[in-house]
Structures are given as structure tokens and as C-alpha cells.
Amino acid sequence: MSKQTERDAFRSRWGFILACIGSAVGMGNIWRFPYLVSAWGGMTFLLPYFLFVLLIGSTGIIGEMALGRSTRSGPIGAFGQAAALRGRRSTGEAVGYIPVLGSLALAIGYSCVVGWIFRYFALALDGGLFAMGQDMNVIVDRFNGTACGWGNNFWLVIALAVNFAIMAFGVGGGIERANKVMMPVLFFLFAGLGVYIATLPGAGDGYRYIFTLDPVGLADPKLWIYAFGQAFFSLSVAGNGTVIYGSYFSDDESIPSAARNVALFDTLAALLAALVIIPAMAAGGADLSDGGPGLMFIFLVNVFNGMPGGRVIGLVFFLCVLFAGLTSLVNLYEVSVEALQDKLHLKRVAAVAVIAVIGTAVSLCIQAIVSDWMDVVSIYICPLGALLAGILFFWVAGKDFVLAAVNKGAGKPIGAWFYPLSKYVYCACALLALIAGALLGGIG
């Protein structure tokens, strides 16, 4: 069932794993996860979050990786080949356009955010960030000026130029190499930030809060919904990015093992962010009362600028954020690049150029509405893509195909629990993510 045509690929197991970690580690880990941990009671939130990471890492991630690898295709080809087992290839391919377009739309919105990050990293580098001091009016005005329509054209174009330059070098030569550098550096620097912040007066209050468990709080259904949503969206199960990276993975490697590592390190990145941000806010005497861009570009800037060594802390922090954003953006755009290569038979550089023009033009135009743009894509299209991938793989392709795809390259067959848990529980979770997100205005 796999394509026999020449296809780019990851050159090593850890290159693949680090790229998948890079795709998963993004803004949700940095500006949403610490806020949710703070808002929902530290360990009271973490316990259900860990349970959902275990569930999704043991089902959805494995399934999407295996779907991509077994078909050697992105979503369009993968969905088509799965549906072809029931004589409905054209229907499957048509459905496959949904996660492809969703990934492109999310990438376009995310480009604006990565452009903000590039600008703030440059400000941290030249001292402009620290020069704002702790004057909240100045800090807020700076961010509002950046996030408005046409307010960040230069840095948005720079961010996309770096992104597409990486992609032009291919999967092994560009994406893998970039992630092999950026991901280890990100973890090392975040750990260093955590160690430094632990030495600051008042940071201990933040740590105590993180590890506080309120059993009564576990009875709140909304806690479980938001913990589930954070795990679901953080692990990048959307029927696109994980499928495409899986299609570049060697048949000789174990998908269950790779999936466990991706889930583990994505969770570790989120925990490191929480262990940096929550104690930092405590040390600065600030309340973590808001998540999203405001946390990162306003409140943390204020806190860092009041710390000893704040200029260096801000620089290191925004470098970490830049790496997290860039590696996620590469993955999001890769889905549509592969689709052009596959459907229009374009050379990689030509496909990258086409998507670069589209991505740059649209992202420049939507800067003023990027928040609403991202909400529509993340609330509706991403969970729909995950649900469609789950249905096509676990329901349409069937048990024999699924187990053969998952077990290929593994040292031992996956347990009997995997197929029913994935088919019934995981697919139900994907449907829940779609419904709950629509009803609550987003859960991840």
C-alpha cells in the first residue's frame, strides 16, 4: 500500500522524534498550560492532564503516525488509501483536504504569532525589551502596536523567510537538522531558566502552588474538560502534522516507542514552562490571572524586567519561545507543501515557493483578526481533522490493517488493548473535543 516513488525521509529515529516534539511543543505549552495549572489548582489540574496525555499518546499519536507511514502520504493520500480498502478512494481523498486546508489556515495564523516572537526576540537582543522597564502602559502599547493590522510586517516576513528556508532544504536536510539543534537547546535553556528562577525570593510560593492537590477540585467537570482539551491540542492530533511526519518515518523503527517519547517530552516541555513562569510570577509578586499572548508579551515582560538579570532572562526566554514557535510552524506548512508535491508533482523548492507566497500574502492581511482566525481553525477544523483521521484509520481501514501498520518495526506487537481503546475511546474523545470546543468557545 505504500508508495514506491522516491520520497524524502527522516534520516534517524531521534531526528523524527525531535521533529514531532518540535511540532507539538508550541505556544499552548508556554502561554496556556501554565495559566491552566495556575487557574485550576496546580496538581489538581496536572493529574487529569497526565491521564489524558497517557490516553492520547497511547492511541491517537500512534494512529496518526502509523496512518502516515503505512501509506507514505499526507492526509489526502493517506485518507484516500484507507478509504480505498472499502472501494471509496475518491471520497477519502476529498475528506483529506479538510485537515490539509486546516493545517494551512492554522499555519497562516500562527505565522503572525511567530512574527511577534521574532520582534520581541530582537527587542530582547538589542535591549529594547528591558528598556521598557515595568511601565505597564509602555509594555501594553508596544504589544498593541505589534499585534495590530499591518503592525509587524517586517518581522512577519523575516519569520516566514526563516521558516521556508528551513523547509526548502527538505525533510532530512532542513526540518530534521533544525529540530536536532532547536529542541535540545530549548530544553537546556528552559531548564537553566528554571534553576535560576528557583533562587529568587518568593519563587517557592509558586512551586508550592504547582504541587498542591485539592481533591475536592477534582469533582469539577470543567477541570477535566480543560485538562483533556489541553492534552488533546498540545499533542498535535489533528489528522495532518503527525500524519505527514509519520509518512517520512522509517519502516524499521517502532511507532509506539516514538509516540511515547513525543508525549513524554511534550509534557516535559509544558512542565518546564510552568516551572519557569509560575514561580517567576510569584517572585515578581504578580498573579497569573490570564493566559494567551497577554501572558507572554505583557505580564512576563513586566516580571522579567523587575528581576535581577532580567535582560538576560528575557533574551533566553524569547529564544526558547522562538524555537518552539518555529518548529511548530514548519510542521504546519509541511502538510500543504507535501500536498502540492503529491497532487501537482511539483519539485520541493517550487512547492515551498508557492506556499510561501500564499502564506505570506494572507498572513500579512489577517494580522488585525488573527485571534478570531485562530479560534475558528482550532475550535472546529483541528478536532474535525483528528476525528476524520481516527475514523478512516480505526474504523474504515480495519483491525488487520491497523495492527500491521502499528506493529511494523516494533520489537514486540502492541497489546490487545490498543485497537478497541483507539477505535472507541480515542475516536469518542476526538468527537468530544469538537463538540466541547464548539459549546465552550474552545478548550485547548
Listing of model-derived features with the role each one plays in the protein:
Residues 2-6, 10, 176, 180-326, ...:
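Membrane-embedded translocation segments of transport machinery
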Residues 32-49, 68-74, 116, 174-182, ...:
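Transmembrane helix-loop boundary segments of multi-pass membrane transporters
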Residues 1-31, 60-65, 69-97, 250-254, ...:
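Membrane-interface "cap" regions at the ends of multi-pass membrane proteins
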Residues 12-52, 240-241, 246, 253-260, ...:
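Transmembrane helix-boundary motif of multi-pass solute transporters/channels
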